[in-house]
């Protein structure tokens, strides 16, 4: 359509004849026809003469100035007609069309032109205004706008104006979007607009090839610039317009001429111009080209016609040499053009007689082919005009590049001889120089080159031509502006051009007519001389020169404008310059890439991919550093090196720069900082960044730091990171650490892009960067948050929590990090990343929260881990929860929630915002979208896709919801969906690439979903992205799923919220990304992590998706959690000594690379699951390797993912690859994967675990602790075993781990890991996501629950219910109210129902995670083991949650809500009580309480719920939970469901943490499934997001976690 409409537009514009217009109406029966018909009608109404008179006079009345100009034009035309029309125009006209007709056409054209000009006067302003409008339109529909804007706009506005703006918009847009092409396009566009402008004229102008009177006007009209210039100089400007038109024509024509000269066949030139025109016209020249031939050809003819053979032909002739040269320069364009020229030209030639007839012309319009032929001259003219043709676009760029060729022709136009010489020189291959003079006499049809040269000469001679020249000049300026200048400059340029033309028009008009304008023009073209002559217009050109063209232009400019003689030499120079210009153009193009981040995102993603090696190298470097620091003396090395890293981070952090590069870096950040191989380096870097950043609160560094720090540091960071490292943040957001590289890898472009996108876009990167660094924490606002960037996220969250007591004490933090366990999911990703990154991050985290780091890093490795882990966890959990919650609120509150979030943010600004976002989320399922991303990812993919798909897909773009931040929330939903993420992941896993791309592209980046998001991400992620658009969100969202949702969405809101959705979006994203990242957190985020991690990671990730790197690296809270998880796991898993971590780090690093891949996979998986489940499925061993690769590595990201998925499926067996199982397995396996990779490092597990944890952030940790850590085998076994065990033993372990073995194992982590895993697995079986969903997701669930739930109908209410406690806090009202009531009720239901649902649905939990889709089975299969026990309970919860998720989403969470509610309050509290007490009762509870108290509002619904109810409930739940992690799990399943079950499992010592984690995971994971679980989870996350909305959200998450 683009092509066609463009072609049509061009055609219509070009043809511009009544028939054409009529025809155009045919094509665009809408607006365009109206104006066109008017013009056409009028022109037809008036005889050609009358038309001429009318144009000159009748039309003049409309523009009195026009009359003058018209009069002048007629004189000019007369001149032109005498010299040019007689020679060229007439000959051409005659050759192609009867001269009489040509005359009539000219007259008519003039009349039309007058009309056009008339409109242009008004249009000028309109154009300027509309320019913006058009710009937007173009932006919205680059091509369509051309077509629609030109056509449609034209009808409303003078066609010229519309075209004009189409031109400007397009060029601007194009420039931004397609710099190189655009450069040509501007000319083309100018020309094209001319066509459209002329279109009205072409009617009459059809036959009047000469269109002498029309020549200037026609040229102006044809040029389309005239409308602008004309409007500008409409009054007296007829002449000026003519000049401008001439200029435009010159600009337009030069290439056309070049093309034609090269074509040397009139037909060829015509088609060539057509081609050129279409391309410029269509933003997508390539798409356009094919059509361009047919479409453009007709317009070409009309173009020639409107130009009035003389004007256009002359100009075209002038341009022809340039065009030829351009073609020579651009063989590609040349070749196609010649073909087009030959074929279309010939067609046109034969039809030219037809073209003569307006009707024929219209027909031609209809028939692209016939359209061209309508006027032999018209066609050539069009061709000239079309010179803009896409092909010429390049050419034009080249020729126009220096505008030397253009300048030559332009100048020549003024003093045509010079241009001719120049053109000749330029078109040396076809030697137009000689042809131009001969061509003048020569018939147009026979020898277009000759005719064109003739025309060129004629214009030189012709005063009228001079007018055209003025126009031409304008064109040059215009074209130049777009080409050289950015959109902004372009506008300025445009204005300048107009002003110049107007200002100089009086003087220069004469000069131009005289031919003196050439120097001016040349100056303008060259930029130098033009500057002298036209300071205004020139200035912009000069700017162009600045763009790198200056030297050449200057050289050309001075010589060329100075002497026609120089033209030859200059022509050579021009040719060289033109050729060089293309390079410059490329440069510009590059610039524009930078300039256009949005487009850049994809490019960046690609770039990232391309630079992956670079990134890897860098990462390797970083890894080495990280490894060294991490391995050697993480505390010592890291602390010292961290600052350097910070500095380095800034380098990297220049994510702006790096972003593109780092897409690898982003990825790397995600990976290095966030995850995997690079994770180490990046973690180091990220960590460093986050470390210093957090410390320094370097907002910018934060970007990188945000990537690393944010990943580690927290949502803010991550969010910051998001922007900072789009890829990185996004990756993290998506997958967390792998996200960056791995994800990018996995998702490949998507993730990186996504990541880039996410951070860049959603995070508002900068905003987040600042925010994250300082903003983030600031976002989080709590000083505490700021205190540790880690805290920033973590800090903010954790810090908020820390403030709460998390930070306050290691214990608190530990507990917090218990949440970290859930964070574990984040950890999954984060852990994976955190293996060392996390480890570093633990340092970092500690750094971030110096306290945390200190004890985390230094002293209490175990405690540190605990504290760290807890810290991370809570932040993660809380953050994630908050994130989800915050986002959720954001979603519902959207602005308000953000406000709420802000409010909450007050305490935990970020979190509150997150909460807001989260809470908001509930409001919109689309909010769910935010949630959905998580949910969608995991659950949404499954559930959301099913349920939320609408929101997911639709709100997917919740863009739909985006409006309300909704993406954020939506993403929150997705965040919740993060779980979905995981599930989606599976889809996405496969889809990953797609989705990643897609999703990512969406910025859903999410694509974390990318995997899940893919499905969703694609569906919802994009929306998230879109919503956030949220491209950032995309990135963030992608965070990726949520990140974006949060980030993008939330980022927007989130961003708004400091949690900026970092928490939510980022976090989620993180979960998503993080989860996706599989970066443990990513993975976790991805999976449940999608959910959970989404929560944690989400939170964190969202912290940034940017965070994910950090989060991953820094882990944000999540990451910290993850790191902590790792650390934390290690923390829990004391044996996960830092050394292990370090060791793991070494493993991790290389493996991290692999992990990266895995992480990518995880990214893919990130569905978290992908990796997570991959690993888990991988049977611990394979999975571990695979998963690890996947999770950690994201090795083949996709491949790995696939493999993992397959294996996972295999392992998953029933669940199949269901993410749930995957997560489940991932819990086992993934830990193995991440952890395994880290293999025995549980730290690895932790780190990886987070990766794993991602899968079972909570469970994972457990698993990781248990499995990998312990054995790595333990985890491996645990992972594998856990996987299986988890499958069976895990289920048992789940129960058993729930028993403390795992707990002991993980301490918390093991429990968490295993239990969590178990729980997670049960939930987590929601593959990593499940974990996220289940265990991991539990928080996500919880967290996400709010999201999911949030999104769900119950989302809000349910959400409230889920967060009933905190609900009140956050906005909890809904949540609270609903949830609360359900809460009470849910316990039973939750227990039974949820449990039940969970058991079967565990998958459901996962289901929405993705497992929900298949996972029920998966979960059932996988989870059943785990779920069997817990599965039943959890299963129920999961099922309920999942169902809720799935069904709840659709269902509206009522049911789920109940369970969730209960779960949340129920298990959540149990989590609090059981977990808190069991695990670090004090930490958990204390932390929780602290968290609670602190977050209390955060509510941590569960906390508050748990707090009062929590304790009781917690107690009860713990029992229940402990008793059957299943039931608790049921409760936890949703929120605590997983959390609870996990909690239950975790109820053991780690329960608090595990529970927390699981809960968090549940919240997180459940985010995916929490949508359903939301209520239950909602209790936690909801609570968090509800209560804390922002802070509570984080806290809530934490709370959920804690609880």
Swiss-Prot record:
One Gene Ontology MF term: DNA-binding transcription factor activity
InterPro entries membership: AHDC1, DUF4683
Keywords: Acetylation, Activator, Chromosome, Developmental protein, Differentiation, Disease variant, DNA-binding, Intellectual disability, Isopeptide bond, Methylation, Nucleus, Phosphoprotein, Repeat, Transcription, Transcription regulation, Ubl conjugation
Protein name: Transcription factor Gibbin
Organism for this UniProt entry: Homo sapiens (Human)
Originating gene: AHDC1
Entry-annotated residues carrying Omega-N-methylarginine: 891
Residues found modified as Phosphothreonine: 1401
GO cellular component: chromosome; nucleus
């Amino acid at each position: 359509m683009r092509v066609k409409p463009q072609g049509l537009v061009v055609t219509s514009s070009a043809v511009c004849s009544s028939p054409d217009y009529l025809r155009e109406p045919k094509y665009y029966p809408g607006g365009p026809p109206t104006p066109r018909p008017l013009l056409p009608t009028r022109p037809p109404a008036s005889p050609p003469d009358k038309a001429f008179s009318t144009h000159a006079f009748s039309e003049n009345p409309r523009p009195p100035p026009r009359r003058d100009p018209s009069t002048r034009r007629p004189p000019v035309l007369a001149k032109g007609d005498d010299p040019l029309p007689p020679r060229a125009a007439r000959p051409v006209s005659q050759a192609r069309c009867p001269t009489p007709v040509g005359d009539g056409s000219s007259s008519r054209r003039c009349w039309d032109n007058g009309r056009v000009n008339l409109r242009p006067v008004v249009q000028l302003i309109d154009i300027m205004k509309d320019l913006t409008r058009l710009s937007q339109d173009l932006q919205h529909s680059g091509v369509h706008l051309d077509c629609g804007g030109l056509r449609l706009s034209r009808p409303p506005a003078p066609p010229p104006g519309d075209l004009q703006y189409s031109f400007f918009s397009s060029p601007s847009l194009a420039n931004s979007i397609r710099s190189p092409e655009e450069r040509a396009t501007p000319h083309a566009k100018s020309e094209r607009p001319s066509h459209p402008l002329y279109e009205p004229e072409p009617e009459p102008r059809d036959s009047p090839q000469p269109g002498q009177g029309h020549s200037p006007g026609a040229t102006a009209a044809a040029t389309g610039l005239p409308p602008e210039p004309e409007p500008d100089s409409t009054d007296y400007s007829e002449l000026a317009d003519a000049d401008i038109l001439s200029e435009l024509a010159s600009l337009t024509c030069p290439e056309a001429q070049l093309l034609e000269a090269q074509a040397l066949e009139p037909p060829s030139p015509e088609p060539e111009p057509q081609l050129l025109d279409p391309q410029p016209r269509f933003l997508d020249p390539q798409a356009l080209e094919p059509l361009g031939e047919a479409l453009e050809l007709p317009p070409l003819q009309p173009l020639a016609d409107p130009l009035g053979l003389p004007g256009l032909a002359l100009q075209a002739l002038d341009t022809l040499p340039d065009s030829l040269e351009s073609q020579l320069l651009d063989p590609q364009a040349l070749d196609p053009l010649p073909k087009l020229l030959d074929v279309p030209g010939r067609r046109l030639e034969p039809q030219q007689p037809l073209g003569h007839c307006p009707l024929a012309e219209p027909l031609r319009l209809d028939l692209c082919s016939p359209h061209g032929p309508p006027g032999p001259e018209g066609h050539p003219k069009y061709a000239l005009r079309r010179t803009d043709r896409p092909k010429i676009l390049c050419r034009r760029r080249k020729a126009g590049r220096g505008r030397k060729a253009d300048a030559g022709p332009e100048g020549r136009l003024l003093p045509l001889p010079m241009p001719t010489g120049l053109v000749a020189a330029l078109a040396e291959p076809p030697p137009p120089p000689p042809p131009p003079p001969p061509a003048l006499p020569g018939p147009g049809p026979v020898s277009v080159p000759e005719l064109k040269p003739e025309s060129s000469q004629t214009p030189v001679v012709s005063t009228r031509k001079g007018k055209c020249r003025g126009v031409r000049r304008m064109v040059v300026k215009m074209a130049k502006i777009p080409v050289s200048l950015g959109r902004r400059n372009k506008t300025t340029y445009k204005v300048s051009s107009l002003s110049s033309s107007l200002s100089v028009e009086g003087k220069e008009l004469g000069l131009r007519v005289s031919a003196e304008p050439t120097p001016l023009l040349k100056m303008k073209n060259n930029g130098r001389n033009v500057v002298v002559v036209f300071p205004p217009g020139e200035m912009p050109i000069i700017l162009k020169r600045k763009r790198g063209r200056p030297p050449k232009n200057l050289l050309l400019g001075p010589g060329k404008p100075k002497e026609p003689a120089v033209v030859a030499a200059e022509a050579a120079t021009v040719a060289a310059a033109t050729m060089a210009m293309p390079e410059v153009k490329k440069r510009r193009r590059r610039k524009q890439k930078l300039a256009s981040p949005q487009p850049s995102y994809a490019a960046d993603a690609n770039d990232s991919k391309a630079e992956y090696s670079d990134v890897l190298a860098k990462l390797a470097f970083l890894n080495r550093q990280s490894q060294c620091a991490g391995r050697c003396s993480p505390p010592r090395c890291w602390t010292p090196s961290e600052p350097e890293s910070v500095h380095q981070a800034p380098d990297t952090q220049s994510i702006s720069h790096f972003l593109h590069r780092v897409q690898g870096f982003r990825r790397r950040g995600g990976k290095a900082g966030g995850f995997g191989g690079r994770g180490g380096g990046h973690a180091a870097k990220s960590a460093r960044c986050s470390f210093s950043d957090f410390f320094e609160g370097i907002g910018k560094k934060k970007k990188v730091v945000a990537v690393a720090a944010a990943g580690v540091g927290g949502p803010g960071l991550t969010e910051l990171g998001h922007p900072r490292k789009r890829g990185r943040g996004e990756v993290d957001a998506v997958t967390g650490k792998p996200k960056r590289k791995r994800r990018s890898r996995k998702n490949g472009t998507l993730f990186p892009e996504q990541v880039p996108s996410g951070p860049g876009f959603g995070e508002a990167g900068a905003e987040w960067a600042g925010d994250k660094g300082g903003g983030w924490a600031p976002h989080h606002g709590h000083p505490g948050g700021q205190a540790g960037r880690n805290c920033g996220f973590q800090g903010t969250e954790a810090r908020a929590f820390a403030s709460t007591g998390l930070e306050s004490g290691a214990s608190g933090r530990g507990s917090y990090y218990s949440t970290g366990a859930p964070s574990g999911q984040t950890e999954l990703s984060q852990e994976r990343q955190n293996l060392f990154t996390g480890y570093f991050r633990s340092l970092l985290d500690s750094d971030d929260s110096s306290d945390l780091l200190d004890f985390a890093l230094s002293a209490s490795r175990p405690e540190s881990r605990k504290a760290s882990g807890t810290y991370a966890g809570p932040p993660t959990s809380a953050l994630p929860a908050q994130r989800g919650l915050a986002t959720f609120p954001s979603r519902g509150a959207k602005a308000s929630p953000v406000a709420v979030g802000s409010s909450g943010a007050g305490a935990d600004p970020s979190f509150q915002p997150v909460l807001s976002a989260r809470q908001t989320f509930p409001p919109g399922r689309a909010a769910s979208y935010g949630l959905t991303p998580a949910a969608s990812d995991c659950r949404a993919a499954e559930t959301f896709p099913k349920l939320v798909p609408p929101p997911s897909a639709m709100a997917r773009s919740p863009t739909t919801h985006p409006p309300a931040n909704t993406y954020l929330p939506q993403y929150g939903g997705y965040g919740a969906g993060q779980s979905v993420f995981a599930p989606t992941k599976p889809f996405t896993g496969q889809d990953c690439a797609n989705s990643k791309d897609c999703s990512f592209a969406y910025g859903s980046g999410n694509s974390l979903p990318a995997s899940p998001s893919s499905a969703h991400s694609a569906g919802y992620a994009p929306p998230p992205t879109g919503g956030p658009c949220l491209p950032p969100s995309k990135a963030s969202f992608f965070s990726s799923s949520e990140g974006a949702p949060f980030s993008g969405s939330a980022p927007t809101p989130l961003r708004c919220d400091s949690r900026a959705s970092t928490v939510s979006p980022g976090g989620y994203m993180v979960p998503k990304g993080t989860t996706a990242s599989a970066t443990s957190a990513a993975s976790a985020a991805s999976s449940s992590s999608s959910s959970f991690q989404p929560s944690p990671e989400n939170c964190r990730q969202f912290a940034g998706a940017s965070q994910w790197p950090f989060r991953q690296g820094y882990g944000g809270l999540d990451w910290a959690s993850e790191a902590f998880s790792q650390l934390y796991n290690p923390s829990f898993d004391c044996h996960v000594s830092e050394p292990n971590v370090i060791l793991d780090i070494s493993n991790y690093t290389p493996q991290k690379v692999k992990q990266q891949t895995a992480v990518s996979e995880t990214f893919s998986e990130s569905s978290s699951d992908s990796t997570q489940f991959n690993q888990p499925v991988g049977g611990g061993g394979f999975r571990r390797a695979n998963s690890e690769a996947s999770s950690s590595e994201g090795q083949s990201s996709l491949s790995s993912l696939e493999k993992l998925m397959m294996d996972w499926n295999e392992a998953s067996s029933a669940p199949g690859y269901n993410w749930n199982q995957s997560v489940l397995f991932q819990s086992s396996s993934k830990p193995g994967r991440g952890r395994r990779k880290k293999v025995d490092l549980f730290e690895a597990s932790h780190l990886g675990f987070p990766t794993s944890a991602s899968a079972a952030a909570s469970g994972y940790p457990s698993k990781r602790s248990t499995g990998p850590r312990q054995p790595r085998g333990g985890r491996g076994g645990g992972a594998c075993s856990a996987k299986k065990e988890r499958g069976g033993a895990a289920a048992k372990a789940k129960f058993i781990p729930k028993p403390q073995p795992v707990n002991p194992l993980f301490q918390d982590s093991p429990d968490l890991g295993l239990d969590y895993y178990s729980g997670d697995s049960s939930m987590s079986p929601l593959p990593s996501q499940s974990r996220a969903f289940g265990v991991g997701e539990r928080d996500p669930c919880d967290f996400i629950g709010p999201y999911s739930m949030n999104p769900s109908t119950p989302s809000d209410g349910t959400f409230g219910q889920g967060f009933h406690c905190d609900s009140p806090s956050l906005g909890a009202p809904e949540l609270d109210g609903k949830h609360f009531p359900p809460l009470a009720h849910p316990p039973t239901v939750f227990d039974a129902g949820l449990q039940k649902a969970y058991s079967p649905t565990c998958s459901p939990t996962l289901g929405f995670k993705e497992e929900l889709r298949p996972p029920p089975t998966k979960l059932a299969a996988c989870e059943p083991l785990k779920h069997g026990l817990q599965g039943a309970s959890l299963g129920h919860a999961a099922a309920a949650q999942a169902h809720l998720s799935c069904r709840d989403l659709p269902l509206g969470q009522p049911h789920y809500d109940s369970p969730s509610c209960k779960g949340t309050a129920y298990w959540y509290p149990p989590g609090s009580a059981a977990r808190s007490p069991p695990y670090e009762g004090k930490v958990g509870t204390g932390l929780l309480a602290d968290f609670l108290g602190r977050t209390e509002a955060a509510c941590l619904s569960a906390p508050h719920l748990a707090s009062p109810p929590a304790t009781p409930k917690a107690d009860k739940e713990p029992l229940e939970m402990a008793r059957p992690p299943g039931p608790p799990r049921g409760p936890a399943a949703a929120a605590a469901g997983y959390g609870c079950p996990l909690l239950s499992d975790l109820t053991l010592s780690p329960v608090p943490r595990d529970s927390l984690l699981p809960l968090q995971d549940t919240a997180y994971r459940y985010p995916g499934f929490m949508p359903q679980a939301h209520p239950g989870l909602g209790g936690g996350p909801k609570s968090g997001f509800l209560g804390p909305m922002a802070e509570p959200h984080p806290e809530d998450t934490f709370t959920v976690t804690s609880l």
